């Protein structure tokens, strides 16, 4: 149980990165983006991989974005408000539902503690889900453990949605919606590729805490499961 909850928190930290997009000076976007998730070079046991998501949905409306992952333990979502600068993580696991709210101060603290990153923009392009994307290489340097890694990003500049990745410590310099990108955490490389982009109206209810969720903090939730 404790390991399962720890995995949920790792995936929740993924969402703080995945749900936050910046859009260039194109047209405003409202709708849903679906991503296929693969694990290149993974040598994890099949039973462990069953705990990780195979797809992700991102809902975008005005200053809001919401990212949803279904895992072997349940559903994990992250809501981000770029105007008021807060995020809400929703955990629906093993019959229990929790909501964790992160303030501007908490978000800024996580940004300050994140490894530094540099972005190299390239001329190479690639068509993904019907959109021409530009390539960028993000180099992440972790001074604490003395490591350096490179992540590949393909992004489209056809949409406009200001400040949606305001608090993204890794991809904050990408000037467009990321339709293919990688993230490496604890040695696990995850690759996200947009499989569909649907322009449609999104209800504001998607970005609110459901009534049947218990509002708590990360510290309180960890204490409930033995500190992790």
What are these regions (language model features)?
Residues 23-228:
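Extended soluble regions of mature proteins
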Residues 1-28:
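Bacterial Sec-dependent N-terminal signal peptides
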């Amino acid at each position: 149980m404790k390991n399962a909850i720890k995995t949920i928190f790792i995936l929740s930290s993924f969402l703080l990165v995945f749900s936050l997009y910046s859009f260039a000076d194109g047209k405003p976007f409202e709708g849903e983006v679906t991503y296929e998730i693969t694990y290149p070079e993974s040598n994890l046991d099949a039973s462990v991989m069953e705990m990780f998501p195979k797809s992700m949905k991102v809902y975008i409306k005005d200053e809001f974005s919401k990212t949803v992952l279904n895992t072997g333990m349940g559903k994990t979502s992250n809501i981000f408000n770029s105007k008021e600068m807060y995020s809400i993580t929703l955990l629906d696991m093993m019959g229990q539902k929790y909501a964790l709210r992160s303030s501007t101060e908490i978000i800024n603290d996580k940004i300050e503690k994140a490894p530094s990153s540099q972005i190299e923009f390239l001329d190479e392009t690639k068509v993904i889900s019907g959109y021409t994307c530009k390539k960028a290489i993000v180099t992440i340097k972790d001074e604490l453990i003395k490591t350096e890694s490179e992540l590949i990003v393909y992004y489209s500049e056809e949409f406009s949605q200001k400040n949606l990745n305001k608090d993204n410590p890794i991809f904050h310099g990408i000037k467009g919606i990321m339709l293919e990108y990688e993230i490496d955490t604890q040695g696990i490389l995850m690759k996200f590729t947009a499989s569909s982009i649907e322009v449609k109206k999104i209800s504001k209810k998607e970005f609110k805490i459901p009534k049947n969720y218990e509002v708590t903090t990360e510290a309180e939730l960890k204490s409930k499961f033995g500190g992790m």
